[in-house]
Amino acid sequence: MSHIRNFSIIAHIDHGKSTLADRFIQMCGGLSEREMEAQVLDSMDLERERGITIKAHSVTLYYKAKDGITYQLNFIDTPGHVDFTYEVSRSLAACEGALLVVDAGQGVEAQSVANCYTAIEQGLEVMPVLNKMDLPQADPDRVKEEIEKIIGIDATDAVACSAKSGMGVDEVLERLVATIPPPTGDIEAPLQALIIDSWFDNYLGVVSLVRVRHGRVKKGDKILVKSTGKLHLVDSVGVFNPKHSATVDLKAGEVGFIIAGIKDIHGAPVGDTLTLSTTPDVDVLPGFKRIQPQVYAGLFPVSSDDFEDFREALQKLTLNDSSLQYSPESSDALGFGFRCGFLGMLHMEIIQERLEREYNLDLITTAPTVIFELLLKTGETIYVDNPSKLPDLSAIEDMREPIVRANILVPQEHLGNVITLCIEKRGVQHDMLFLGTQVQVSYDLPMNEVVLDFFDRLKSVSRGYASLDYHFDRYQSANLVKLDVLINGEKVDALALIVHRDNAHYKGRALTEKMKELIPRQMFDVAIQAAIGGQIVARTTVKALRKNVLAKCYGGDVSRKRKLLEKQKAGKKRMKQVGNVEIPQEAFLAVLRLE
């Protein structure tokens, strides 16, 4: 036990977590030269393409330290993106320590601060590491000062290394073995194991990644899942080094996988406790708080035949990504689909892309919305996540929108732009701290504004230097209205938006203009209108294509020409009454990209 170290790596996006993980694997001989490739742990295609870590990955390595003892290192590479904080908090629950990796050129960023606080709250030992020391712009002294000022942990003897060139990595491992405490637990006690993550394998059933707190588990044991009360027979146990490798057993303090032929997708939920069937009254370990989705959007299969496949794909994905929630919904314009809850826009894009790639589905997404709290005149409070479910305005006493507390870290020279952006998004400044060359501003912003494009805009006004971390704070009354889009006088439910009254005219105009570009021209005029209640606030028309019916007339009598034109006009009028307009997929997403 005293030779085991469990730790995870926390850092902001692009500060070199995954590269550092590669170096660890290389130094401890986890893979042969041939199998070694950049970012070994980012195994999903999507992760490699976007260069981000989405899922937390676990690896077990054996490191022979300078004192001659071989240590077993179980480490978990975690995502750095604000949308995946949940993955991080789960990984931390399985560890005794964390490496805080900071880019020595860029300094501390908002995301590392947030994840670091999570680690300190869970009582982990945090060890700062300065990465990218081989870069010319590295400034270790300034960064150490920032770590002390912003996060408040002692960084005077932070290890300096460069994961790319491999400089100082052995020093990191030595320091790690010395500072991070070994796990506590009793091998002889009854089995108690926490499920950190699980995924579905078509051949093996549910594979669970577990951290064993007490006792041991081996092949052939009967295990009991505490929340479902079901018994399963263990087929195999083992660790990732980084490949699957089976071991005899998993003992207290270790992190590894258990395969027990569970075929039911909800058979081993994340955050659950496993024990042996002989000791069913073991205490349940404190799991993780269920995270509430912040953004909701409708996902619909393009062809309605795919609906069942889509449901199955969602079930399998929910197992692997427990922060995704979904419920069936139907729309007049799009047929049957699901209303899904996500943690943020990036999460939504990733899920949609994973569904399309891994399960070969064609999907249409509607504009994302947040949850609104409504107080009805009857005195009851309801929560609405879908604009088309909004009750009549006359029945509503008060509408409240979710407000987030956003912490933004930005270099001083970009501060003005960031403040302008926050004001434009109806933000209220809460506090401002000057820390060295950086400023930490905190704002209360309506989540509705943050969800759509705030992150991208923030990056562009600050040339990529600002970083953002936000969390839900409260609901607050606001003057909100529902903006409907009518195409040829018919409401399209999938295009409705809930907006602030002050922005409603502007949003309506922008939306109709955008739709005009995207809806293809028909043989008749198509009117696109934006309405608040019964009042039309904006209108554009997609002009009809018309055939020149007078082409064959040459000279001739005006009454002949008039007859042909009247006939064309009558035809167009008839067409307009029965014609319906196909709305392309881009039009539904136009709502996202309103400047």
Swiss-Prot record:
Disulfide bonds: none
Domain tr-type G: 2-184
Pfam family, one: GTP_EFTU
Bilayer topology: Peripheral membrane protein
Residues in the signal sequence: none
Transmembrane regions listed in the UniProt entry: none
Primary location recorded for the protein, binned into one broad class: membrane
Entry-linked InterPro entries: EF-4, EFG_III/V, EFG_V-like, EFTu-like_2, LepA_C_sf, LepA_CTD, LepA_IV, P-loop_NTPase
Keywords assigned: Cell inner membrane, Cell membrane, GTP-binding, Hydrolase, Membrane, Nucleotide-binding, Protein biosynthesis
GO molecular function: GTP binding; GTPase activity; guanosine tetraphosphate binding; ribosome binding; translation elongation factor activity
CDD domains, per database record: EF4_II, EF4_III, LepA, lepA_C
Catalysed reactions, semicolon-separated: GTP + H2O = GDP + phosphate + H(+)
EC number(s) reported in the record: 3.6.5.n1
Gene Ontology terms describing biological process: positive regulation of translation
Top EC category: hydrolase
Subcellular location: Cell inner membrane
Binding site for GTP: 14-19, 131-134
GO cellular component: plasma membrane
Protein's job: Required for accurate and efficient protein synthesis under certain stress conditions. May act as a fidelity factor of the translation reaction, by catalyzing a one-codon backward translocation of tRNAs on improperly translocated ribosomes. Back-translocation proceeds from a post-translocation (POST) complex to a pre-translocation (PRE) complex, thus giving elongation factor G a second chance to translocate the tRNAs correctly. Binds to ribosomes in a GTP-dependent manner.
Family in the record: Belongs to the TRAFAC class translation factor GTPase superfamily. Classic translation factor GTPase family. LepA subfamily.
NCBIfam families assigned to the protein according to its UniProt record, in alphabetical order: lepA, small_GTP
Protein name: Elongation factor 4
Record organism: Pseudomonas syringae pv. tomato (strain ATCC BAA-871 / DC3000)
